[in-house]
Swiss-Prot record:
GO MF annotations, alphabetized: phosphatidylinositol binding; ubiquitin binding
Name of this chain's protein: Class E vacuolar protein-sorting machinery protein HSE1
Organism for this UniProt entry: Phaeosphaeria nodorum (strain SN15 / ATCC MYA-4574 / FGSC 10173) (Glume blotch fungus)
Regions of compositional bias (Low complexity) in chain numbering: 196-214, 495-509, 582-593
GO biological process: protein transport to vacuole involved in ubiquitin-dependent protein catabolic process via the multivesicular body sorting pathway
Span of the signal peptide: none
SH3 domain sequence ranges: 216-275
Coiled coil stretches, renumbered: none
VHS domain boundaries: 16-145
Entry-linked SMART domains: SH3, VHS
Location of this chain's protein in the cell: Endosome membrane
Protein family (similarity comment): Belongs to the STAM family.
Main location as per UniProt: membrane
Gene: HSE1
Length: 618
């Protein structure tokens, strides 16, 4: 009969602020707005329903109610503004903000919404109650409103120097304290620490880090407000988080690490934490020891309760032992919860550190494998190619020359210089083979070496064939061999025209040195034999490279093997070619093998010391 009249907005407001919602449901919120506009008392009834929801102990319900009130203020006109600025609604929000059991996020949201409404209602003097309530809330709770972020200005050189000086001073003080600390001093300071601990409960609220403080003397800070990053590289944290300080980045921004994440944060959002002293560390160790000491009592209590239950005993409160064990173990529960939170945070930090280390190791191994799979790049230049009959490049580095380059001749190259007497064949221990040019060819001229750049001690001499390359001359080449395996050219193995006894046996300028005479024979006496006049053609051509085999001196008793009748037929006719004009027409005496001489060339006599008819056999 005297029951209060029900509010028609209770159901729709409860539906829009349900604690099971995962986010604001704007469909339900707009339904409340439409219903408020359809009734004359809708604004008053809706605010009354929201005051009831603000008294709910669930933080989500309180946050959804504040969001609903903000939507009504923007969509329901001046009548809703008057109800929101009423004494009843503002007092309800102040009670909620000053309640110590209220969640910090709810308090911050109340301060935020009251600030927005104060600005919105500032043009109407009848709505000044909201502004007064907002100023009162700011005065009573200065830490509710997050400050504005400072500007990111670069640290000057003087600030860097100051930070370094503070770091050196802190290190010196730490070393001094570690050396001067003694167990007796620790015991003497114990009562003072206990007194300080008792008086610390009445300490004032923590203050943010003062501007200008350097990161050299600060290792940890505690967050005073929630911080949401607005730019890349900023560190997100919640109020109460402990952040490890790494370094100073900007003047009022430090770099820190929290739960494996690294970023910068503003100094006015955190407070400085002192490093734990030795007494604090000992106290933490003592607390852990007390908790672990109760493990045996907890296990004993479980065993007694299990036995009592299986035996069908009466009320457990009658058992004094069970009651005593229960109360003794119940005292460690707050300490146990604190240790669980402490080591859970450490476990998360170590887990994230391990994940970072694993990632770094994988990146390093992949980088190492990639570098090993690529072939090493040569640090020197490759040998430039060059063509035939061309000298090597001047910048090419080869082996030092061991001897001057040999003279090279080719067909059609002209006669050698007049200042040098040609040698047929070259003077040496191992005369090389000689090739007879075709009839009518000009005598090849000697190619004089062209002056080039200064000799390089590692350059390849001209005229030598580089290893793995081809000769630079088109002249045919053969290797000198011993007399027992020298090939015999059957095409030129017929007897030449008759020769007088005094005809020379070697070309112009050929002299058998005394040191090269065959063993058992005296050295040659007299002047060297003279060759044909300079105008006469030379049938010999010097090869471009010296012989590579050592040839023993020719043996005058070495003769070609006799021609066997059953051998291959000769490839050339056995008759002598027609004698050239001016040559003797007498028949050739019977003799051994003689080299072929072209027409117009004076026949050669047996070499000096050659032993008669045997001659020099190749």
């Amino acid at each position: 009969m005297f029951r209060a009249q029900s509010n028609i907005f209770d159901d729709v407001v409860v539906k829009a602020t349900d604690e099971n919602l995962t986010s604001e449901n704007w469909e339900y919120i707009l339904d409340v707005c439409d219903k408020v506009g359809s009734s004359d008392t809708g604004a008053k009834d809706a605010v009354a329903a929201m005051i009831k929801r603000l008294a709910h102990r669930n933080a989500n319900v309180q946050l959804y109610t504040l969001e609903l009130a903000n939507a009504l203020s923007q969509n329901c006109g001046i009548q809703m503004h008057k109800e929101l600025a009423s004494r009843s609604f503002t007092d309800a929000m102040l009670r909620l903000a000053n309640d110590r059991n209220t969640h910090q996020a709810v308090k911050a949201k109340i301060l935020e919404r009251m600030g927005e409404w104060s600005e919105m209602f500032s043009r109407d003097p009848d709505l000044g109650i909201m502004e007064g309530a907002y100023m009162k809330l700011k005065t009573q709770n200065p830490n509710l409103r997050a400050p504005s972020k400072p500007q990111k200005t670069q640290i000057s050189d003087s600030d860097r120097q100051k930070e370094e000086e503070e770091l050196q001073m802190a290190l010196a003080m730490s070393i001094k304290e570690s050396k001067g600390a003694t167990p007796s001093a620790a015991k003497a300071n114990a009562p003072q620490e206990s007194n300080a601990g008792s008086s610390s409960q009445a300490a004032p609220a923590p203050q943010p880090v003062q501007p200008g403080t350097t990161a050299a003397t600060v290792s940890r800070v505690r967050a005073l407000f929630d911080f949401q990053p607005s730019e890349p590289g900023e560190l997100q944290f919640k109020k109460g988080d402990i952040i490890a300080v790494l370094e100073s980045v900007y003047k009022d921004w430090w770099k820190g690490s929290l739960r494996g994440n690294t970023g910068i944060f503003p100094l006015n959002y955190v407070e400085k934490l002192q490093d734990p002293t030795r007494e604090e560390l000992e106290k933490e160790a003592q607390t852990e020891a007390e908790v672990f000491a109760q493990i045996r009592n907890v296990e004993k209590l479980l065993a007694l309760l299990s036995t009592n239950t299986q035996a069908g005993g009466g009320d457990g409160r009658d058992n004094e032992e069970i009651t005593e064990l229960y109360h003794s173990t119940l005292a460690i529960r707050p300490k146990l919860i604190e240790l669980i939170g402490k080591y859970s945070q450490k476990k998360d930090d170590f887990t994230q550190l391990n994940e970072k280390f694993i990632k770094a190791r994988r990146d390093y191994e992949s980088l190492l494998e990639a570098s090993m799979s690529q072939p090493p790049q040569p640090s020197y230049g490759s040998r430039p190619p060059y063509g035939y009959n061309a000298p090597p490049p001047s910048n090419y580095t080869g082996y030092p020359p061991s001897s001057p380059p040999p003279q090279q001749y080719g067909y059609g190259a002209g006669a050698p210089p007049q200042g040098s007497a040609p040698q047929y064949p070259p003077v040496g221990a191992n005369p090389a083979f000689f090739m007879v040019p075709p009839a009518g060819e000009q005598r090849p001229q000697q190619q004089t070496p062209q002056p080039g750049p200064p000799s390089d001690p590692y350059s390849l001499p001209q005229g030598r064939v580089p290893i793995g390359g081809r000769p630079q001359s088109y002249a045919p080449q053969e290797l000198a061999t011993a007399h027992y395996d020298s090939p015999v050219d059957n095409r030129h193995s017929f007897a030449g025209p008759s020769q007088p006894q005094g005809a020379p046996s070697a070309p112009q300028g050929y002299e058998y040195p005394p040191s090269q005479a065959p063993p058992g024979y005296p050295p040659q006496q007299g002047a060297p034999l003279q060759g044909p006049p300079p105008g006469q053609q030379n049938p010999y051509e010097q090869i471009s490279s010296p012989p590579t085999h050592q040839q023993p001196p020719s043996d005058p008793y070495s003769q070609p093997p006799p021609q066997v009748g059953h051998g291959y037929p000769p490839q050339q006719p056995a008759h002598a070619p027609p004698a050239p004009p001016g040559a003797s027409s007498s028949p050739a005496p019977a003799q051994g093998y003689l080299p072929y001489r072209p027409p117009g060339q004076a026949p050669s006599a047996p070499p000096v010391g050659g032993g008669g008819d045997e001659g020099f056999y190749r």
